[in-house]
Design a protein with these regions (language model features):
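Active-site loop-to-helix "anion-binding N-cap" substructures in soluble metabolic enzymes
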Residues: 2-251
Length: 251
């Protein structure tokens, strides 16, 4: 019955292309566009987050279908200014982005702290972008049993003084699972998803799982009760693999 509920609801599939892709990559999207117009997509919602250099091209490519566009990061300032090499949320919105990934562990490792992420989220919300807010614990934190403490802190500080949360998605990505092929046990993931949603008063935000999501493990991952979708890294570079993930979620 739980699985039936999962496969009858809207699920979000976010393709995080990271620092991959060129204009030649646009040709690989034809299969995805065709799939998005078929009944096989079921209630899947596809969101592509390419590098900034490709956002405008992706936007044009996807104009006549239901695939949405997102960015992967932004400068914290809503205002334009003298910030060489950076791009802000307003600029991303102006070239077609509707979503943005913020707080990804790869950026946290480079020095992004909760306060900075909070500033970025506020700026992006002001630009009318929907936020995919990444949270997750390291392997050592997980082994010490600190997962819930870390997630609670990241949520509290990252969303500090943000009252309206309807345009925020939470993406739970255990840092030790990203790109490693290792995923937590399904029953553990279910507890974490429940815990994350329990951090919010009223209607909780939609929660996605990210970390080594691929066509081989999606049949297990789709069993997670109360999950709203997936943040997909490497597997999303392949149209076939990304489509397979969506198909298997609804099969």
């Amino acid at each position: 019955i739980i699985l039936q509920q999962m496969t009858n609801k809207y699920m979000y599939f976010v393709a995080n292309w990271k620092m991959f892709g060129s204009l030649k990559s646009l040709n690989t999207l034809n299969k995805v566009i065709k799939f998005s117009k078929s009944k096989e997509i079921n209630k899947g919602r596809l969101i592509y987050c390419p590098p900034n250099t490709l956002i405008s091209s992706f936007f044009k490519k996807f104009q006549n279908c239901l695939i949405d566009i997102g960015a992967q990061n932004c400068h914290e300032s809503y205002d334009y200014g003298a910030h060489t090499g950076f791009i802000n949320s307003r600029m991303l919105k102006s070239v077609g982005a509707n979503y943005i990934i913020l707080g990804h562990s790869e950026n946290r490792k480079k020095g992004e702290n909760d306060k900075l992420i909070n500033m970025k989220i506020k700026s992006a919300l002001k630009s009318k972008l929907k936020i995919i807010f990444c949270i997750g614990e390291s392997l050592s934190e997980n082994k010490k049993g600190k997962t819930k403490i870390i997630l609670s802190k990241q949520i509290r500080l990252g969303l500090n003084k943000i009252k309206k949360k309807s345009n925020i998605f939470i993406a739970y990505e255990p840092v030790w699972s990203i790109g490693t092929g290792k995923i937590p046990k399904i029953n553990e993931l279910e507890k974490i998803i429940r815990y994350i949603k329990g951090q919010f008063k009223g209607k909780p935000p939609k929660v996605l799982y990210g970390g080594s999501v691929n066509p081989k493990n999606i049949n297990d991952l789709k069993k997670i009760n109360n999950l709203d979708g997936f943040l997909v890294g490497a597997a999303s570079h392949s149209a076939k693999k990304f489509i397979d993930i969506v198909k298997k979620t609804y099969s």
